[in-house]
Amino acid sequence: MNKDIIIGIDAGTSLIKAVAFTTNGRELGISSTPNEYTIKSDGKATQSLELTWKNCCKVIKDLGNQFNNFEKRVCLISVTGQGDGTWLIDKNGEPVCDAWLWLDSRSSDIAKKLTNLESEEMRFIATGTGMFSGQQSSQLLFMETHHRETLDKAKTAFHCKDWIYYKLTGIKATDPSESCFTFGNFRTQEY
């Protein structure tokens, strides 16, 4: 059996999609399902890690049902997902709390204070990005002050796509562009 199918997964905030391609890039099939998130008046915007994973499994299964011998034909899975946010797991790989999404604004005061520091220009030059409340840096600082018990339980901070990759492989990893986005130098890819 030839391994002739590439799967692309996009774990978006409101929709999760999976697309099957040939190894030459021709689209073969697609599946999608809505993804749920919660927004509160205090700026809270969260999403269940478990539900996001369950929805990813659903779209992969639905996609697989479109092909014969799907499992044996897949040669590659690529994962992308919503940017920024904070997806925390404990030492056993279990979610500590719902993910703080990129549109969560609870840490906006912290982001504003960080933006006004003298070191902001140096940080911007290194990271190539402006500071905002949806980034892990400001969210983790907010948690340190207001949700210490949650942060104390956490062993790993992921972004959405890293969570999906972890669930697919059991490996805790990210790509250099993601890890350097708010905490490192994107030019040198150093953390």
Tell what function each PLM region has.
Residues 1-97, 153:
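N-terminal glycine/serine-rich phosphate-binding loop of ATP-dependent small-molecule kinases
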Residues 11-13, 123-191:
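Gly/Ser/Thr-rich active-site cleft segment
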Residues 29, 115-117, 172:
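Short, compositionally biased low-complexity segments
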Residues 65-69, 116, 145, 149:
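Secondary-structure boundary motif
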Residues 67-101, 127-134, 165-185:
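Short beta-strand-loop/turn "lid" adjacent to the catalytic site in phosphate-handling enzymes
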Residues 91-95, 113, 117-122:
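Hydrophobic or amphipathic alpha-helical targeting/insertion segments
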Residues 104:
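Carbohydrate-associated surface elements
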Residues 110:
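Active-site metal-coordination/substrate-binding segment of hydrolases
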